[in-house]
Amino acid sequence: MEGDGPAATAPQYQPVCPTRDACVYNSCYCEENIWKLCEYIKTHNQYLLEECYAVFISNEKKMVPIWKQQARPENGPVIWDYHVVLLHVSREGQSFIYDLDTILPFPCPFDIYIEDALKSDDDIHLQFRRKFRVVRADSYLKHFASDRSHMKDSSGNWREPPPEYPCIETGDSKMNLNDFISMDPAVGWGAVYTLPEFVHRFSSKTYQA
């Protein structure tokens, strides 16, 4: 079945970045990992940046199940408060997801990622249904800021070791991560979608129809 869909065209697809192992990666800092990936694309393939988006996955309860994650590679999902991936929509209409925390291929054809990592809302309780804030990569690079305070416990200790490079900040902000995690369309940057809306907007099958 997979061979009949986007995977069949995958050999013609040119990834926007090097291998997974060559990407900047820090566990539990997915928002920065994707920011760094956007930065790489801007530096090496400026024109491709226009085809890329940072995608925040969360909901009002900040409880979103995602399958096929390295943190739980077996059949069950990981319940994240939020997760961030890169979406590339090529000029040929192929959509690929770059998830540095998945055990699926890197990059992964959009429709395969939806089927295997996100599955369907029909089988998920209402409070766990995912929403997606889709932000253009150039806007993400320009506006995102994090002082990493969300990764410290009440005693000020790191829950996970922070990246060695300096905190990402802008001229206007040192911390606006919550504006990206929020699924309130009136807040922050980009557009907010439900899972069906996200699939309809970016599925490679939609482009082929």
Swiss-Prot record:
Changing D81N: Impaired N-terminal glutamine amidohydrolase activity. GO terms for biological process: protein catabolic process; protein modification process. Its EC number is 3.5.1.122. Its main location: cytoplasm. Belongs to the NTAQ1 family. GO terms for cellular component: cytosol; nucleus. Changing C38A: Does not strongly affect N-terminal glutamine amidohydrolase activity. Keywords: Cytoplasm, Hydrolase, Nucleus. Gene3D superfamilies: Protein N-terminal glutamine amidohydrolase, alpha beta roll. Monomer. It comes from the Eukaryota. It is found in: Cytoplasm, Cytosol; Nucleus. The active site is at C30, H83, D99. PANTHER family: PROTEIN N-TERMINAL GLUTAMINE AMIDOHYDROLASE. GO terms for molecular function: protein-N-terminal asparagine amidohydrolase activity; protein-N-terminal glutamine amidohydrolase activity. This is Protein N-terminal glutamine amidohydrolase. It comes from Mus musculus. Mediates the side-chain deamidation of N-terminal glutamine residues to glutamate, an important step in N-end rule pathway of protein degradation. Conversion of the resulting N-terminal glutamine to glutamate renders the protein susceptible to arginylation, polyubiquitination and degradation as specified by the N-end rule. Does not act on substrates with internal or C-terminal glutamine and does not act on non-glutamine residues in any position. Does not deaminate acetylated N-terminal glutamine. It catalyses: N-terminal L-glutaminyl-[protein] + H2O = N-terminal L-glutamyl-[protein] + NH4(+). Widely expressed.
